[in-house]
Amino acid sequence: MSKSDYIELEGFVKEKLPNTTFMVELENGHCILAHISGKIRKHYIRILPGDKVTVEMTPYDLTKGRITFRHK
């Protein structure tokens, strides 16, 4: 799957769950489960409830995603 096949959306972290998983509320009102990407994990970027994040989703499963960026 190429990079252009992913859907990028913005949302806010609603809740922190075990194993670096987060409940993210998207700007359109939907809530999804999202895990953090490898670069965020590698650089020890902390994500807390209330943070604005960019989420990458696949068109095949719209209930899960990957957090690729934390906005300042």
From Swiss-Prot:
Span of domain S1-like: 1-72
Q: Which CDD domains match?
A: S1_IF1
Task: Write out the GO MF terms.
Answer: ribosome binding; rRNA binding; translation initiation factor activity
Signal peptide (residue range): none
Q: What is its main location?
A: cytoplasm
Query: Would you name any one GO CC term?
Result: cytosol
Top-rank lineage group of the source organism: Bacteria
Keyword annotations of the record: Cytoplasm, Initiation factor, Protein biosynthesis, RNA-binding, rRNA-binding
Kindly list any coiled-coil regions of this protein: none
**Cell location:** Cytoplasm
Q: Which InterPro entries match?
A: NA-bd_OB-fold, RNA-binding_domain_S1_IF1, S1_domain, TIF_IF1
Subunit comment: Component of the 30S ribosomal translation pre-initiation complex which assembles on the 30S ribosome in the order IF-2 and IF-3, IF-1 and N-formylmethionyl-tRNA(fMet); mRNA recruitment can occur at any time during PIC assembly.
Protein task: One of the essential components for the initiation of protein synthesis. Stabilizes the binding of IF-2 and IF-3 on the 30S subunit to which N-formylmethionyl-tRNA(fMet) subsequently binds. Helps modulate mRNA selection, yielding the 30S pre-initiation complex (PIC). Upon addition of the 50S ribosomal subunit IF-1, IF-2 and IF-3 are released leaving the mature 70S translation initiation complex.
Please state which protein family the record places this protein in: Belongs to the IF-1 family.
Question: What protein name is recorded for this chain?
Answer: Translation initiation factor IF-1
* Lineage of origin: Bacteria, Pseudomonadati, Pseudomonadota, Gammaproteobacteria, Candidatus Pseudothioglobaceae
Gene it is expressed from: infA
